[in-house]
Amino acid sequence: MKTPFGKTPGQRSRADAGHAGVSANMMKKRTSHKKHRTSVGPSKPVSQPRRNIVGCRIQHGWREGNGPVTQWKGTVLDQVPVNPSLYLIKYDGFDCVYGLELNKDERVSALEVLPDRVATSRISDAHLADTMIGKAVEHMFETEDGSKDEWRGMVLARAPVMNTWFYITYEKDPVLYMYQLLDDYKEGDLRIMPDSNDSPPAEREPGEVVDSLVGKQVEYAKEDGSKRTGMVIHQVEAKPSVYFIKFDDDFHIYVYDLVKTS
């Protein structure tokens, strides 16, 4: 299976997902997305103390099969409580959030924690930031010919660590993305849809236990009859029926409404 490493944003293989792929020209044309990756040799590995690396900048080598080693830099967003080996990472120049077992995956080499800190910024409009969480949106992307293409999706949450970024997913491509949506809103590239007729979630009493699928193993039947397995790793607070799933054969984080009825 093709991996996201070494691919440009939006060119990730979706053959095993059962969904149409996102073409590269649908991604935001920002300078960070125009970086070119070159093959490099592994850097000197650091010692193995298992420090908490959430919030840290990292770099590591990646080698798929007999291919060359490529170097990757990114920010560690989270360590998954139900699978502490699994980290969520935002790589520089890429829009997807990736899930990797950094200390176990044999394709990862020379993992280093970098000295540079993640810059923190003040949210320019806290009320707007809170308002868009859990909302359906229309997000405009610039295509190669300069025209606009509209993607409907849902804003899921403020991203951890990178505090001016938001988690979002799309109907056309239900994986976890990150964008600075306040900027897009102010530029006219993001529109919050009117509230639907869906009833709001019921208020819960303090201390009330709510059933959750987090930590459960899941099985997904593909169109060709084969199956893929994975784990539910997160429940979206703003939409409790929506969950993040990490499949065993993929690095992307999938976003599904697991309680939706037809």
UniProtKB/Swiss-Prot annotation:
Keywords associated with the record: Acetylation, Cell cycle, Chromatin regulator, Cytoplasm, Cytoskeleton, Developmental protein, DNA-binding, Isopeptide bond, Meiosis, Nucleus, Phosphoprotein, Repeat, Ubl conjugation, Wnt signaling pathway
Site location (Histone H3K4me3 and H3R8me2a binding): 173, 180, 184
Location of the region described as Tudor-like domain 2 in the Swiss-Prot/TrEMBL record: 132-193
Region annotation (Tudor-like domain 1) ranges: 53-116
GO biological process terms held by the UniProt record: female meiotic nuclear division; positive regulation of DNA-templated transcription; positive regulation of Wnt signaling pathway; protein localization to chromatin; rRNA transcription; transposable element silencing by piRNA-mediated DNA methylation; Wnt signaling pathway
UniProt entry tagged with the keyword Iron: no
Localisation per UniProt entry: Nucleus; Cytoplasm, Cytoskeleton, Spindle; Nucleus, Nucleolus
Ranges for region Histone H3K4me3 and H3R8me2a binding: 93-98, 142, 250-252
KO phenotype (gene knockout): Early postnatal lethality. Ovarian folliculogenesis and oocyte growth appear normal but fully grown oocytes show defects in resuming meiosis.
UniProt region (Tudor-like domain 3), positions on chain: 213-262
Region feature Disordered, mapped onto this chain: 1-49
Modifications the protein undergoes after translation, according to the UniProt entry: Phosphorylated during oocyte meiotic maturation.
GO molecular function per UniProt: DNA binding; histone H3K4me3 reader activity; histone reader activity; methylated histone binding
Tissues where this protein is expressed: Oocyte, egg, and very early embryo; not in the 8-, and 16-cell stage of the embryo. Isoform 1: Present in testis. Isoform 1 is more highly expressed in adult testes compared with newborn testes (at protein level).
Principal location: nucleus
Location in chain, cross-link Glycyl lysine isopeptide (Lys-Gly) (interchain with G-Cter in SUMO2): 7, 28, 44
Residues the record lists as N6-acetyllysine modifications: 44
Basic residues bias locations: 27-38
Entry note about domains: The 3 tudor-like domains (also named Spin/Ssty repeats) specifically recognize and bind methylated histones. H3K4me3 and H3R8me2a are recognized by tudor-like domains 2 and 1, respectively.
Family: Belongs to the SPIN/STSY family.
Classification via PANTHER family: SPINDLIN
Subunit structure: Homodimer; may form higher-order oligomers. Interacts with TCF7L2/TCF4; the interaction is direct. Interacts with HABP4 and SERBP1. Interacts with SPINDOC; SPINDOC stabilizes SPIN1 and enhances its association with bivalent H3K4me3K9me3 mark. Interacts with SPOCD1; promoting recruitment of PIWIL4 and SPOCD1 to transposons.
UniProt name for this protein: Spindlin-1
Species the sequence originates in: Mus musculus
